[in-house]
């Protein structure tokens, strides 16, 4: 049997590569064999901002938890109940684990599947309180409900040539798209994306795909702002002050139709407050820059601590708030 290694969270600020058990077709929560699953050999895996929350000690993650929920891999072993996925297939793995059979999955709310985590709705690989599934920052990993959860690339050779792009399909791009979509972006929309990291840039590009007329991207880091500019977005340097003033200079009005929070609760302040953490800053600012009856897409809300947002500040505008589904 092949050896397996994974990246384990040990304590705040400390991770280490460990030898771990080779995966089995096994559900760790119900302790039963799962013939609907497969075992993957990992081709690529990414570091998510959510992983960093754990590593920084911002969650109750236990020592020894194997990290990683952004996975692309090659199918090594197939359970006998799997119909459409074959050994040797190259596949993308959505970060949330879903059964495809429960009411929530049938209503397309796969992020809160009722069957993959006995403790609460919703499950994911390598994350605290999300069902006990081993993470994908490893050499091999188990994926349950393979016919439902895996996206097979039709041409293996072409997939390998584009693997650095396709690796974003497991989390980064769909998360950004979900933020733009739930914010109601459509033809002619004006949009503000708070955060120019990978997910924020994916949200900005998704807003363009959805037909936005103007997309603003706010961040503190010049390289991120330049990247946003490179594909047609208007950069907003929040280290220079409030985004609303800069948006008005470019748009002629101080408000947009839709906004997305792609930063989350480890946000920093604007202008002179940019050197320290201010959890409520981003969400409160997108409420300020969005017009009355506009929509907000909040990608990073699930783990937010008390003080993340002052929702009273948005009450007068009657926003449609769309947290992750």
Residue positions per predicted region:
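Glycine-rich beta-strand-centered segment in the early N-terminal region that forms part
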Residues: 27-46, 55-106, 111, 133-134, ...
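Hydrophobic/small residue at the entry helix of a nucleotide-binding pocket
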Residues: 175, 198-199
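Conserved acidic E/D residue at the C-terminus of a beta-strand in Rossmann-like folds
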Residues: 219-220
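NAD(P)H dinucleotide-binding glycine-rich loop of Rossmann-like/cofactor-binding domains
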Residues: 99-192
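C-terminal hydrophobic helical "lid"/dimerization subdomain
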Residues: 1-6, 28-31, 35-36, 299-325
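Residue-level marker of beta-strand positions
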Residues: 70, 87-90, 104, 140, ...
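Glycine-rich cofactor phosphate-binding loops and adjacent beta1-alpha1 units
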Residues: 183-185, 210, 226, 231-298
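Short beta-strand element of Class I
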Residues: 213-216
């Amino acid at each position: 049997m092949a050896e397996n290694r994974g990246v384990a969270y040990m304590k705040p600020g400390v991770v280490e590569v460990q030898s771990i058990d080779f995966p089995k077709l096994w559900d760790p929560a119900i302790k039963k064999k799962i013939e609907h699953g497969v075992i993957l050999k990992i081709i690529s895996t990414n570091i998510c901002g959510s992983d960093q929350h754990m590593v920084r000690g911002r969650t109750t993650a236990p020592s020894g938890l194997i990290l990683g929920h952004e996975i692309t891999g090659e199918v090594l072993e197939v359970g006998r109940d799997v119909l459409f996925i074959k050994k040797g297939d190259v596949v993308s793995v959505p970060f949330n684990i879903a059964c495809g059979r429960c009411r929530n999955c049938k209503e397309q709310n796969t992020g809160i599947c009722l069957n993959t985590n006995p403790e609460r709705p919703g499950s994911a690989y390598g994350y605290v309180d999300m069902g006990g599934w081993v993470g994908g920052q490893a050499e091999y990993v188990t994926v349950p409900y393979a016919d439902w959860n895996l996206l097979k690339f039709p041409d293996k050779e072409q997939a390998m040539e584009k693997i650095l792009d396709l690796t974003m399909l497991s989390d980064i791009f769909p998360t950004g798209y979900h933020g733009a979509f739930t914010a109601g972006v459509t033809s002619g929309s004006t949009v503000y994306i708070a955060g120019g990291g990978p997910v924020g840039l994916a949200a900005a590009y998704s807003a363009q795909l959805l037909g936005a007329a103007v997309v603003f991207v706010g961040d503190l880091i010049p390289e991120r702002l330049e990247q946003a500019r490179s594909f047609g977005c208007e950069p907003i340097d929040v280290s220079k002050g409030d985004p609303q003033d800069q948006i008005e200079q470019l748009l002629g009005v101080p408000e947009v139709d839709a906004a997305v929070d792609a930063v989350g609760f480890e946000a920093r302040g604007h202008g002179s407050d940019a050197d320290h953490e201010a959890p409520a800053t981003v969400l409160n600012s997108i409420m300020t820059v969005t017009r009355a009856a506009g929509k907000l897409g909040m990608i990073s809300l699930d783990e937010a601590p008390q003080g993340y947002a002052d929702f009273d500040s948005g009450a007068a505008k009657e926003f449609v708030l769309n947290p992750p589904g």
